[in-house]
């Protein structure tokens, strides 16, 4: 949620900054009109309450003097009814304003490149060289089928499309990856490890910005107002909802492994094979709560920490700065880390690292005090994938594939896999 003080003081300027995000702003102009109506209603209610207090005092005087006060009591009741009617109107206006505020996207940071689509994203840096093959590189689903380590067909029978069974060394590779990722972030970068709930309530989904806008993308539990988490960002950020943190403890860094669940409502026909776009997948998520003045430095740190996973795995990648039109609803600035996928001859997203500034903190009411008796301020929140595990499996299978159908295990993972060096047919 953006700062209402900023919105009221700079309405047209804020609108001009939001337009390049390409989000639906159809309700945006209504805010100014309704906000003015809200102020008018508050003024009327306060005026009538003042009048009611005066009348109440007059009634008290008349009663002490044993005089007739019926006509004044009637007037007081009429004023009370008018106040009740205006209060109801005010609640309706405030509810509508709250709905509009929840639909307004975050304001892009001035450093974000202006553009409409992913074609306008800016490459920041590349790392590593794409492997050279003397043959046509195979897609990871064919490699996995040959090695008997992933089973999409049986998962489709058991559940449906966009699900998978990991088995044998495939399951062990997945487990090795998330253990390696967690060890790196916890041991080297001092993150606190968390295992979160996989279901959250509506308030939590609203706090991080998934609701109300993206409800169709979420899996909802019948007869309960619970949702399966699309990312561990949701429960981890909401750990501190409605709390005031001590500034001495910031930054707070969490690393969480979880399954993630997404309906992929708008992805029909895209990435229908393989691990790139699944309804259920595992991910290691990094979440930060920081002081406002530190958040952009922390974004660079966060991105570098996610990159380090790929560097240690020796997987080629690039870092992209997302343009305004590809920034998404909640982020003020976002980097995508994209790993090389040989069979597609392109880079694919494997991590998004975002600074939300105070956008999520306002929605979730997360604040901090610089001093024990200081005025509470909203924290800035950040999160990034460190990394999406299934996509990392896909990248390893494709980049480390051999002509005989085997796959070399990255050196850094071998201690997690019984010192095996290769996955053979």
UniProtKB/Swiss-Prot annotation:
Database matches in InterPro entries: aa-tRNA-synt_IIb (IPR002314), aa-tRNA-synth_II (IPR006195), aa-tRNA-synth_II/BPL/LPL (IPR045864), Ser-tRNA-ligase_type_1 (IPR002317), Ser-tRNA-synth_1_N (IPR015866), SerRS_1_N_sf (IPR042103), SerRS_core (IPR033729), tRNA-bd_arm (IPR010978)
A GO MF term: catalytic activity, acting on a protein
Record keyword Cytoplasm present: yes
Chief location bin: cytoplasm
GO annotation, biological process: selenocysteine biosynthetic process; seryl-tRNA aminoacylation
EC number(s) reported in the record: 6.1.1.11
GO cellular component, one term: cytoplasm
Record field: catalytic activity: tRNA(Ser) + L-serine + ATP = L-seryl-tRNA(Ser) + AMP + diphosphate + H(+); tRNA(Sec) + L-serine + ATP = L-seryl-tRNA(Sec) + AMP + diphosphate + H(+)
Binding site for L-serine: 231-233, 285, 385
Pathway stated in the Swiss-Prot or TrEMBL entry: Aminoacyl-tRNA biosynthesis; selenocysteinyl-tRNA(Sec) biosynthesis; L-seryl-tRNA(Sec) from L-serine and tRNA(Sec): step 1/1
Binding site for ATP: 262-264, 349-352
Compartments where found: Cytoplasm
Keyword Nuclease in annotation: no
Alphabetically ordered keywords of this record: Aminoacyl-tRNA synthetase, ATP-binding, Cytoplasm, Ligase, Nucleotide-binding, Protein biosynthesis
Function: Catalyzes the attachment of serine to tRNA(Ser). Is also able to aminoacylate tRNA(Sec) with serine, to form the misacylated tRNA L-seryl-tRNA(Sec), which will be further converted into selenocysteinyl-tRNA(Sec).
Family: Belongs to the class-II aminoacyl-tRNA synthetase family. Type-1 seryl-tRNA synthetase subfamily.
Quaternary context: Homodimer. The tRNA molecule binds across the dimer.
Note on domains (UniProt): Consists of two distinct domains, a catalytic core and a N-terminal extension that is involved in tRNA binding.
Protein name per the record: Serine--tRNA ligase
Native species: Bacillus velezensis (strain DSM 23117 / BGSC 10A6 / LMG 26770 / FZB42) (Bacillus amyloliquefaciens subsp. plantarum)
């Amino acid at each position: 949620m953006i700062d209402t003080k900023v919105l009221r003081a700079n309405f047209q300027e804020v609108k001009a900054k939001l337009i390049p995000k390409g989000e639906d702003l159809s309700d945006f102009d209504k805010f100014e009109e309704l906000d003015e109506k809200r102020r008018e209603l508050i003024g009327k209610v306060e005026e009538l309450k003042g009048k009611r207090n005066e009348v109440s005092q007059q009634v008290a005087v008349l009663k002490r003097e044993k005089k007739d006060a019926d006509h004044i009591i009637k007037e007081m009741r009429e004023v009370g009814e008018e106040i009740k009617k205006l209060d109801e109107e005010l609640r309706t206006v405030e509810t509508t304003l709250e709905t509009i505020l929840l639909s307004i996207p975050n304001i892009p940071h001035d450093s974000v490149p202006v553009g409409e689509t992913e074609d306008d994203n800016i490459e920041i840096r590349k790392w590593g060289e794409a492997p050279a093959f003397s043959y046509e590189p195979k897609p990871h689903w064919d490699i996995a089928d040959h090695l008997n380590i992933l089973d999409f067909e049986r998962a489709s029978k058991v559940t449906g499309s966009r699900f998978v069974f990991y088995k044998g060394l495939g399951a062990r590779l997945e487990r090795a990856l998330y253990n390696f990722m967690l060890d790196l972030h916890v041991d080297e970068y001092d993150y606190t490890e968390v295992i979160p709930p996989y279901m959250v309530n509506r308030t939590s989904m609203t706090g991080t910005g998934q609701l109300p806008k993206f409800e169709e993308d979420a899996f909802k539990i019948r007869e309960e107002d619970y949702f399966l988490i699309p990312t561990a960002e949701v429960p981890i950020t909401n750990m501190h909802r409605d709390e005031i943190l001590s500034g001495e403890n910031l930054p707070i860094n969490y690393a969480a492994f979880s399954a993630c669940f997404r309906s992929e409502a708008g992805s029909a026909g895209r990435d229908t094979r393989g691990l790139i776009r699944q309804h259920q997948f595992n991910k290691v998520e990094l979440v930060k709560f920081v002081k406002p003045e530190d958040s952009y430095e922390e974004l660079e740190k966060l991105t570098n920490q996610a990159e380090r996973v790929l560097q240690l795995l020796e997987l080629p990648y690039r870092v992209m700065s997302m343009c305004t039109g590809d920034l998404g609803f909640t982020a003020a600035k976002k980097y995508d880390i994209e790993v090389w996928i040989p069979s597609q001859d392109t880079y694919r997203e494997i991590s998004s690292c975002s600074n939300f500034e105070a956008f999520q903190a306002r929605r979730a009411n997360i604040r901090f005090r610089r001093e024990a008796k200081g005025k509470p301020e909203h924290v800035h929140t950040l999160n990034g994938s460190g990394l999406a595990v299934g996509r990392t499996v896909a990248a390893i299978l494709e980049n480390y594939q051999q002509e005989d159908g085997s796959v070399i295990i990255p050196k850094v993972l071998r201690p997690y896999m019984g010192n095996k060096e290769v996955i053979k047919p």
